[in-house]
Amino acid sequence: MSSNPTSSVREFEYKAEMKQLLNLIVHSLYTHPEIFLRELISNASDALGKARFRMLSSDEGLDKSGDLKITITVDKESGSFVIEDTGIGMSEEELISNLGTVASSGTLGFMEALKEQQKEGQRLDANLIGQFGVGFYSVFMVTDEVTVETKSIESGLQGWRWKSSGQGSYTIEPVEREARGTRISFILKEEFREFAQEYRVEQIIKKYSNFVEYPIYIGSRQINSMTALWQRPKSELKQEEVNEFYKFIANDFKDPLDYLHVSVEGAVSFKALLFIPSEAPMELLYNQGALEKRGPQLYVKKVLIQHECRDLLPEYLRFVSGVVDTEDLPLNVSRELVQASPVMAKIKQILTTKLLGWFDTIAKEEPEKFRAFYKAFGTILKIGLNTDFTNRDKLIDLLRFETTKTVEGEYVTLKEYVGRMAEGQTEIYYHSGSSRAQMLAHPNLEYFRKRDIEVLLLSDPVDVFVIPSIFEYDKKPLKSIEKAEIDMSTVEPEGERLSAEGTVGVISLFKEVLGERVADVVESRRLVSSPVTLVSGKDALDSQFEKMMKMMNKDADMPSTKKILEINTAHPIIRNLAGKHAVGLSTDPVVRAAVTQLFESALLLEGDLESVADYVSRMNELVEAATRS
C-alpha cells in the first residue's frame, strides 16, 4: 500500500492475487461481456436487502430516506454507463475491504476452477464469477476505468469515491454525497457500446435479473417484474418463468433438472420453491468447504433475511437451491436466533422429509432423470448416511450401485440386489476400487464369479467411508470381499490341491522370503485362476479406505497395514514352487525372486506397489532365467 499524506486522494496497490484475478477475468470471460450487468445488479440487490434489514431491525442512527431501488442511466453517444442503488452503502473501511481486496479463498477458488476448465478444454463457464464472489470485477471487461461513489446508511458518515483502471492500483478520496447508497459509473470501451443502448440493457435485465425483488429502472421506466413465484399456487406457475427464476437466484445459466413447490399450513407455516441443479455447481467441485456455506434463501414475510441460510437443510442436501418464506419468525431475527429457533428446526425437518420423498418419486417415475440427478449429487447425498440417522433408511433406499452383473452405467438398488441373490446366499458382498475395470480384474472376484454371486462395485471415493457403516440391509450383513473373515470353510477348493505337507512347505517358503511384509500367508479357497491375492484381516482397514486416509493426511506418514497373502495351491506356479522347496531349493535366487514377484504382482493390482523399477528389473531377471539355454 502506498499513499500521499499531502493530498486527500490516497493511492493503494492491489495485492498480487488481485492483479492475477483481474487479468483472468478480462482475458478468460471476454466471450460473456453482458454478465457485468448481471453482477452489478446482483450486488446492488444485496446492498438494498441489507439496507432493508437494517431499517427493520433498528430505529436509531440510520438514513431511512428514499425508496429502495436500482436506477440505470446510459448514453449511447458518449458511451457512459451509470448504475445507482439506494442500499446500505459503504464506509471508507468497507470500501477498501470490499473493492480493494478479495477474500483469498474466493479469489483462489475462482482462479483454480477457471484454470481447471481451461486445462480440460471445457467451454468456460461465466457462472463461475458469481459463485466465487468476484462479480464486481467483471466490469473491467467492458471499461478501462471505474468510479464508485458511496455513502453508508449510518447517519453522519462521510461519502467516498473509489477509482481504478483495474491495473495495479486504486485511489480513494472523500466526496460530498447526500443520499445513502452506491453509484458506479464508467465509459464503455468502443467495442462494447451496445450496452449504452436502453433496449440492450432491458434485454439483459429481463434475461438475468427479472426477479430481483427491488425495482430496476432505466431512467423512469421500471423493467423487472419483482414476482414472488413461491407465493403463487403451483398450478399457476409456468415452466419457463420457473426456469428463469432459478437461473436468477442460483446464478446459473442452465435450466434446473427439476423443482419442488412446497406450501405448508399448520403449527408451522411456510412456502418454498426448491430446485435441483442440472449439474453440480463448480464451487462444490473445487471447494471442499462449500457445502458448509450453502443453503436456500430465507425470507420472513417476503423480506430477505439470509441469502444462504445453512439452517434450512442438512449439509448433504445443500446442493438444493431455492427460497423459503415464513411468517412464523420475527423480521429482526438474528443469525443466532435462527440457529436456535424451534420454528427453523421444524421447517428443516419438513423440508428434508419432502425432498427425500421427492427424490424417491423421481427414482420410481422418472428413472432417467434420477440417473442424471444421482450422477451429479449421489456422492453428496451419501454424506447423510453418517450424519442423518433419522432419515438413514430413506437415504439407503436412494443408493444406486453398479455390480458385477450390470453393464457400465447401469445401477441397482439394495432392494433389487437382495431380490436376485443366489440361492443360499445370506450376505451382501461389495468390492471397492478406483475404477470398474480395476475391480473386475481383481482375483478376489474369482470365487464369486465362479458361483454366480453378484458383487456391488464401489468406485466412488466416499463409498469406503459410508457403505461399511450400513452394516446390514433387510437383515443381511454387508461384507467386503477383501476381508479374510468371509466364511468359505464349506467351499471345496478348486482343482487338484497340494498335499497337506506340500501346502505347509510352500507357505513356509513364502513366509521366509516375505518376512514382515505380510501379516500372514494362508491357503486360499477364493482363488480359481490366479496364483495369489491379498486380503485384509478382520479388524484391518479396507484398502481403498486406507488409501483415502493417506490422501487426506499426506503429512502424517501413515504406515501401510500389512495384508494376508492367500495362495492358490492348485495353481501351477505355486505347485512348482512347492516342488522346488521340497527338493531343498528354497534358497535358489530364482525361486526367491519368483515368490517376491508374485507378492508384488498382488500389490500392483491393489495399486500399492512402491517401486515399479525394482519390479520390472526383477521381472527381467526371471525372464532371462526362463530363457537361458
Swiss-Prot record:
Residues 336-547 are annotated as: B. Residues 548-629 are annotated as: C. Keywords: ATP-binding, Chaperone, Cytoplasm, Nucleotide-binding, Stress response. Signal peptide: none annotated. Molecular chaperone. Has ATPase activity. Belongs to the heat shock protein 90 family. This is Chaperone protein HtpG.
